[in-house]
Amino acid sequence: MTSLRIHTIDQLLETLDQLVEKSERGDRSHPSAAGFWTELLTKPGHPLSTQLPDEPLVDWHERGLLGTLDGARVLDIGCGGGRNSRWFAEQGAVVEGIDLAAPLLDAVRPTLPDTVTLTALDVLRDPLPAGPFDVVYDSGCFHHLAPHRRITYVERVLPTVRPGGRFGIVTFAADRVDSPTDLQIVSTGDTAGGMTFSLEDLRTIFTPLKPLDLRPVNPNREHTFAPDFLNTALFTSP
């Protein structure tokens, strides 16, 4: 039986998904990667096993760029062990944390405040928690998506930000970490453990939003998670 030729955008995206799934590293944005992320995020000594909040969050909050967090609704994308979800809750926010790593979420759920709800889901394919949200934050999920799925991410995630709300993101920095080009990734299916983005990349990808802050993460801020190989950006929704 001859399969139908590609004739829709969804079919094209799904075909490209198959290329990524066939690579040795696999598709780390797919639910099948739950075990990988659970092991990585609980590995003793791994930088991501920290309980510290991201440096940009603390900085933006002190500068008043996040708005009032007391009573705010927050969506924490790729929440992992819940360190940023916990920080938001400590500021008075009601938090929806989402991540692929169901075993990890089951382990950390009892340790988090009651105002944090954790849900295991695929940000690209599963229904997202009902918005709108005052703050949507992504610490390291976006840079693991295959290039063609950035389109899906933008179409699904940005509408969850309320008008006047905030969207914040942290990614690998293009000038600090090596990564393949999008063409190389699409050709080989290998996402190489994550992709890098320049500040201009972030500005362009999230064009529907208004930028408030684009900069490298400040590695000198104490009591925060602040590796020197990350870029960060904060936007507001019109």
Q: Language-model features: where?
A:
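Short catalytic micro-motifs in class I SAM-dependent methyltransferases
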Residues: 140-144
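Class I (Rossmann-like) S-adenosyl-L-methionine-dependent methyltransferase catalytic domain
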Residues: 2-128, 145-156, 166-238
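Short beta-strands and strand-loop turn motifs
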Residues: 138-139, 170
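A short acidic, Gly/Pro-enriched loop at the edge of an enzyme's catalytic core
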Residues: 128-136
